Regions:
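Conserved N-terminal phosphate-binding loop of PLP-dependent enzymes in the Aspartate aminotransferase
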Residues: 1-173
Length: 173
């Protein structure tokens, strides 16, 4: 749904099989699936979604994304091969995730280092999510991964050797 309105407006899309659709399709109200919310059919959200779908078709966005997915996969592989403190590197389409391999929760500190370099990531604990917009270029994705590498190195440089399970906190400059 975020691809339809960039997450700014409530909009979703449901895809199903014809058998499931037919189970709910009827003129009798009691047979219908009457679940919705107060944003149902919002004209602004529908207009934004239709415009997005037109752009997807006109600009062949899904084909373009295939090349971006490959660039992201290459960047993730380089991070994984760089002997940096990350683990559980994974990717599905244009969403990539890796986990910071520290006993302390440093996701927010890492996010702040990246933000200082102009890259916004989404940390959830020590899990770092990369969700670039579809209009990102391959060069920009390469730049993002360069910054991630730099910030991981910087994070390592400022982390004292703290035993696992220690309650000592870490302050980054």
């Amino acid at each position: 749904s975020k691809g339809l309105t960039a997450g700014y407006l409530p909009m979703s899309c449901v895809m199903t099989t014809d058998n499931v659709y037919q189970a709910f399709y009827d003129d009798k109200v009691e047979k219908g699936f009457l679940h919705s919310h107060s944003f149902t059919g919002n004209p602004l959200a529908c207009s934004a979604a239709l415009a997005s779908l037109e752009l997807f078709e006109r600009d062949n966005v899904l084909l373009h994304n295939q090349s971006l997915i490959q660039v992201m996969a290459h960047g993730l592989q380089q991070l994984a091969d760089a002997n940096l403190p990350i683990k559980f590197v994974r990717q599905t389409g244009m969403i990539a995730v890796f986990t910071l391999d520290f006993s302390q929760n440093l996701g927010k500190a890492f996010a702040n280092l990246c933000l200082d370099q102009g890259v916004m990531i989404r940390p959830i604990g020590n899990h770092v999510y990369l969700i670039p917009p579809y209009c990102t270029t391959p060069a920009e994705i390469g730049h993002i991964f360069g910054i991630l590498n730099h910030c991981l190195q910087k994070l390592c440089d400022h982390i004292p050797q703290i035993p696992k399970g220690s309650s000592q906190t870490i302050d980054l400059p």
